[in-house]
Amino acid sequence: MLYNVKCYFIGYYFIKEDPFMTYEMDIAGLKRDLPLCKVTDDLYIGAFVIFGDVELTVHCAAELLKRAPEYDYLLAPEAKSIPLLYEMARQSGADEYFLARKGPKAYMSGVFEVNVKSITTMSVQKLVIDTADAEKIKGKRVLILDDVISTGESLRATEELVRQAGGIVAGRMAVLAEGDAINQDDIIVLGHLPLFNPDGTVKA
C-alpha cells in the first residue's frame, strides 16, 4: 500500500518526515509496511529495520533456519543483523555465535582484523573479531548472516574475515535481497526488496 512519503538520506542516516509513503512487504508470510526513504532525487529505498520488532525477528530467524545449510557457527557483521543473529542461535540451540565488529574493543583478548577494499566506493572496510573467536572458527563451517544484502560489500568483507581465519564459508543468508542483489545465485534470502521511484512505484 502506498502513502504519501517524505524521507531524506543524510550521510548514514535516513530522515523521515510525516506524512510518508510505505511499501507493504510480505516476508515469508509476515507483512510489514516499510517506509520509503530518499537516497537520490530519482531513487528511494524501503527501510527494513528489524530492531525492536520481536515478532519479525523470531519469524525471520525461524524461516531462515528452515532454509539454512549445515554449519558449525553463525557469524554476522555488526550492527543491524545482531537481533537476527542472536535469535537464530537461540532457536537452533547454539551455545555461542560470533559478531564481526567495525573496530577493536577493549574486551578482546587479541585482535584478528581484515581490511577489504570496496568495489563500488574504493574505500576500505575494516572488520574485527577476537583472536579467540578466530581460533574457534578455524576449520569450521561458518554461516554468514545479514539483514539485507544490497551491494554485497559487507558480505564480501565478512567472507574474507572467515577465510583469513581459516574457516569455511558454509553459506550466505539474509532476510531480504535489495535490487539486483536478488540475482546472486550464492545467497539464500526470504524475499526481494525492490528499489523505488520518487512517486513510490517500483523501479523496472
Sequence positions of predicted segments:
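Short Gly/Thr/Asp-enriched flexible loops that form oxyanion-binding sites at enzyme active sites
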Residues: 84-92, 159
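Short, glycine/charge-rich flexible loops or terminal/linker lids adjacent to PRPP-binding catalytic cores
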Residues: 95-142
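Short glycine-rich phosphate-binding loop at a beta-alpha junction
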Residues: 71-78
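Short, Lys/Arg-enriched N-terminal segments with co-localized hydrophobic residues
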Residues: 3-20
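PRPP-dependent phosphoribosyltransferase catalytic core
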Residues: 19-24, 156-204
